[in-house]
Amino acid sequence: MSSDGSAGKAVVEAKGLNPGLIVLLVIGGLLVTFLIANYVMYMYAQKNLPPRKKKPLSKKKLKREKLKQGVPVPGE
């Protein structure tokens, strides 16, 4: 009797992969593909896009910075 039970388990295991494992492999594969694609696009952008321009400082901020440094602001 015990030999029949173990043979039945062997047949079930030989049927195929666990569906949960297949789902994990698919999700893992998609995640790895996504990360690799992001890295490739990042490297492409670093080579081909011009560097970002700094935002222009407003007159108010320029005045404040000059006051901090002790430089007299013209017009005052």
Swiss-Prot record:
Record field: compositional bias (Basic residues): 51-66
GO CC list: nucleus
Family: Belongs to the S1FA transcription factor family.
Span of the annotated motif Nuclear localization signal: 50-55
Record function comment: DNA-binding protein that specifically recognizes a negative element (S1F) within the RPS1 promoter.
Any one GO MF annotation of this record: DNA binding
This protein's name: DNA-binding protein S1FA2
Major localization listed first in the record, in broad terms: nucleus
Subcellular location: Nucleus
Disordered as annotated region, ranges: 51-76
Alphabetically ordered keywords of this record: DNA-binding, Nucleus, Repressor, Transcription, Transcription regulation
GO terms (BP aspect): regulation of DNA-templated transcription
Naturally occurring in which organism (per UniProt): Arabidopsis thaliana (Mouse-ear cress)
PANTHER family (UniProt xref): DNA-BINDING PROTEIN S1FA1-RELATED (PTHR35298:SF11), DNA-BINDING PROTEIN S1FA2 (PTHR35298)
Gene name tied to this protein: S1FA2
